[in-house]
Amino acid sequence: MNELRPKNRAYQGYHRREIPREDERLTHTDPNTPMGELMRRYWQPVCLSAQLADLPLALLIMGEELVAFRDGGGRVGVLHRHCTHRGASLEFGRIADRGIRCCYHGWHFDVDGTVIDTPGEPPGSTIKHNACQGAYPAREAHGLVFAYMGPPDAVPDFPDYDTFHLPGVELVPYSIRHDCNWLQVHENLMDPLHAVFLHSRMGAIQLTEAWGEMPVTEWLELGDRVCYVASRRIGGNVWVRFNEVATPNFGQVGGFWEDGLAETFFQRVGATRWTVPNDDRTSTIFGLRHFSERLEAKGIGNKALVGVESLDIYGQTGHRPYAEMQRNTGDWEAEVSQRPIAIHALEHRGTTDRGVVLLRNHLLRALGAPPAPPSAVGGIVPTYTSNTVVSVPAPPGADDRALLRAVGRKVADIVAAGNALDPRERPAIIAARLAALRGMKLEAGEAP
């Protein structure tokens, strides 16, 4: 009788040399790919507003070579990079009071791609009526430039999230290029367990010591969102972290410096971000770092460090000495080092990876469905991302992890149930409901 041979055997490199193909459905985003066409149905950031000065800016977004500029009238244009006349790059163009001119023969384009003038043509020439420069609708918000690259007859409303309007919060834009596929960067947001190891136990403490506590974690789908709820025991308190991503590449993360030592209720976002493919092997995070007295009470954050290729959170860019990256590895190295495109078929996924699997399946289902705009209340889209720290002592002689799970579920239910509230009143109402969880005990029948 043949016995089952264990796979965990020594020196098996020879038998593990084959590298399968990547999952093209999720990772490829060029024109006419399923994920690429889905992403093009949403407004995508393409650069920072501050990058558009007196010269055009060359861009690569989802495999398309583009150029962005701000004309003399202050309008932003996002055009195909190569001039429709003879293909010269408009990154070398001349910004005009209205639109941009190609440096080669002076063809003049408006921000919408229409041809204004073809100066080398004779009077009466109709060539400008038979040509146009590819262009995409563009708009600015909170220091970022967004473009809509989908069908022109299906432009969605621009999503206005509640965390963009919180009193006393300053939004500071940033961008970080990653030398890898967009998905392995994005799905890190649904992997809260990596923080225990990468940010805490495997090197220097990168955030606070509380991150090194192993959480009780659950993942859930709420409409267009995939979320995680991670509950940690910090002395007599329970710290519940609620993070979210939304279809297809939007995400928010809670405040970074929470230590769980003092109560806080529905403390909101530390960063909002979009993970935008440049091509299939490179991507850029465009984000908004959130600063407020409440979020930065410990004085750790630094607005001066936030911008192009810079963030005030350790390990988020590739601009550190290589030896330091090896000794105290950050998110950037962990994500980029999974290969230019991570190979899902080679993974041995465990319980810590449930959120990643849930996100991948969520995206696969989205590929076969029409884009669904996020639900808004009075034009404002409610979001969930938050930190809550509530005084709930550990039960003597009982299963504390079951209590942590129950507290996390209560927090998630309260936050999600507040979607229909007036956005101006929602934070205070949710915070009051969360405060009522103080001293919560495990009810009979509740189990891990």
Descriptions of predicted regions:
Residues 27-35, 55, 124-125, 133-135, ...:
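Intrinsically disordered, low-complexity boundary segments flanking structured domains
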Residues 43, 54, 113, 193-197, ...:
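Secondary-structure boundary/capping signal
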Residues 40, 132, 139-141, 269, ...:
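A short, structural micro-pattern
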Residues 2-10, 75, 146, 152-448:
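C-terminal catalytic domain of Rieske-type non-heme iron oxygenases
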Residues 42-44, 64, 134, 224, ...:
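Short beta-strand or tight-loop elements
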Residues 2-65:
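Zn-dependent metallo-beta-lactamase
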Residues 3-6, 45-171, 214-216, 413, ...:
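Rieske [2Fe-2S] iron-sulfur-binding domain
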